[in-house]
Amino acid sequence: MEIPHIPVLLNEVQEIFKNLKTGYFLDCTLGFGGHSEALLKNHPDLKFIACDQDQQALEFSKKRLKDFRNRITFMQSNFSEVLEKISHKEELRGILADIGVSSFQLDNNERGFSVNSDFLDMRMNQNSKISAYEIINTYTKEQLTSIFKDYGELHDAHFIAEKICLERSKNPIKSAKELYQIIGKGKQNHRKISKATLAFQAIRIEVNQELKVLKDFLGHLENLKPKNCILAIISFHSLEDRIVKQFFKKWSKNCICNEKIMRCECGNNHSLGQIITKKAISASKEELLKNSRSSCAKMRAFYFNNLDNK
């Protein structure tokens, strides 16, 4: 079986979860099963719940992981909703979310993620109603400007939005190739990534509501307060990493009083656990040589302890 995607930070993921023995492991973003396959092999007494919103990826992984079918339950779901759907929440001992786009999605012409694609789609869940085509051809100039500024951190967001609106007034923009030509190949000052790449990334975030989905997922975890559970999140965008970092910092605090208050009044017992990774873990030099797409990957991990704080 040809594997269409190389899992990032595979060794680092295995290291984070190496001490897990029994219970349930939740792979929120199964993709093509690389992380789960390695963990299933190394943890024979763990049971797995494997979720993905991409039907193609899910079907592939069912075949790839068929030897472990007695230990794994598959589910099609966006990872922001999965915690509301699964059983065995009390028995969760590990949770992994790799929230990047797979190589298969990027390289598949029909999915419309790549700047070279003949399509303009970018939906991770192909059943979603809104695609990149609708956003590019129906959003107002102000809406497009906001997307490019907030999600792409592009200094000339207004100019890019203006160019798109001008071109679509002549004919609808139907392909990623066409959009790429409109945006241009230049780079932002002091940034290595091209303007078009940042703009495409911003559109993809809007199509899939990626930042909202991440915040919803972390919010559900905060409410769930799993016990004796390790959470690892791999992100590929600075905005996503910032959100994860902020949540982990908040969860690790005992005192939640206003910083201006001189004396603690909250009980000083609100910590949900400890941050495992002092700094985000990045790909090694060896991995970068094998898989250049791992260059943006950052992993952070948190341990939910077994204390009932309230």
Curated annotation (Swiss-Prot):
A UniProt-annotated Pfam family: Methyltransf_5
Keywords on record: Cytoplasm, Methyltransferase, rRNA processing, S-adenosyl-L-methionine, Transferase
Keyword Cytoplasm among record annotations: yes
Binding annotation for S-adenosyl-L-methionine: G33, G34, H35, D52, F79, D98, Q105
Gene Ontology CC: cytoplasm
Gene Ontology MF: a single term: rRNA (cytosine-N4-)-methyltransferase activity
Domain of life: Bacteria
Reaction equations catalysed: cytidine(1402) in 16S rRNA + S-adenosyl-L-methionine = N(4)-methylcytidine(1402) in 16S rRNA + S-adenosyl-L-homocysteine + H(+)
Task of the protein: Specifically methylates the N4 position of cytidine in position 1402 (C1402) of 16S rRNA.
Family membership: Belongs to the methyltransferase superfamily. RsmH family.
Protein name (database record): Ribosomal RNA small subunit methyltransferase H
Source organism (scientific name): Campylobacter jejuni (strain RM1221)
UniProt gene name: rsmH
